[in-house]
Amino acid sequence: MGNSMHSEPSPAIPGIGVHSGQVMTVLGPIPVEDLGVTLTHEHILSDVGCNGPEPPEASRKALFHKPLTMDILGEVRLLPQCNRDNQRLTDLDLVVSEVEKYCHWGGRTIVEMTLDGAGRVPLGLKMVSHRTDVQIVMGAGYYIEFSHPPHVRTMSADDIADEIVRDLTEGVPGTGVGAGIIGEIGIDMDFTAEEEKSLRGAARAARRTQVPMSIHVPGGSTRSHEYRTRIMDILEEEGASLEHVIMDHVQIHPTSMESQMAIAERGAFLGYDGISSGFDWGERGMGPGDEESAADIKHLIEAGYLHHILLSHDVHLKIMLTAYGGWGYAYILRQFVKRLRAHGVTDQDITTMLVENPKRLFSSRYQRGNGFGNP
């Protein structure tokens, strides 16, 4: 996998990366200044069956294969992976309706983290963007090993890097749709050799293109802090800049406040991307409620980490859509900002997290530095 240390980033590829002043969307590049209100971790069209394989028990198989209907919603909320249909976001008209609600509440951009092997549909995302006027930034790379297409096992880290660079610079083959972020690169409970290979390939692509990264770390694991530390060490070893990396799912137990601060101290962004999930993750542990997340965000702001916080919902299941009784993509704008204000978070702080920090993620022109200077 290589152990070389890179002290300097590669020269920028013209037109992309954090020095370009642009962000690639599924409809083409836009100025960073035009991002507007941005959710930095969502799924619009996806199929995350990798998170829930068919159960071995005959008694559970019927529920697993049943269409998601009102009579089983309660059961599915207790364990979202127990139903296969719940894990599919494939109805174009449905997701257009859901994304339109986000646009109605002032949302401008969504960073879409679905990857090859987990249901990425580049042309579908292009259609959603056309129909909703919401800017969509598509991801590149590979999620957790269980989702990897078979050919990934035969690839080297450099092969993976080349493929990601192609998606970023030329577009996904056969679609002409370009990716604008690397991720969400998946690390699961066991942090397998294949996942490390994928991570190193992604980091090398980030070094070559200077395009931001987003890294999935399993919530509910007692090893989350250990894994995040190891991930950041690998990224730095491969020459990726942590100042343009999101460490996802930091609010999910048992990630401590000390662990979150340690991530920010190394320069990375804190992905508060489970706002309003509203269900129990079963054996992986219960995510914090919005009240706890709001209090933690206020604590981080008071400790000086405002410019490291990004907000999102991580919508990836049908039960998270408003059509199935969920809160959808507009919940942060409709409700969670009120909870933040109740904790003393100012409107300027909210704008920083939803507008200015995404600009910092995608552009080196917006400085954090000592004291977190204003853009």
Question: Where are the regions that the model predicts?
Answer:
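Active-site beta-loop-alpha junctions enriched in small/polar residues
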Residues: 43-45, 115-116, 141-145, 184-187, ...
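Short acidic/histidine-rich active-site segments
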Residues: 216, 273-275, 304-326
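Mid-to-C-terminal alpha-helical segments outside catalytic/metal-binding sites
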Residues: 17-29, 331-375
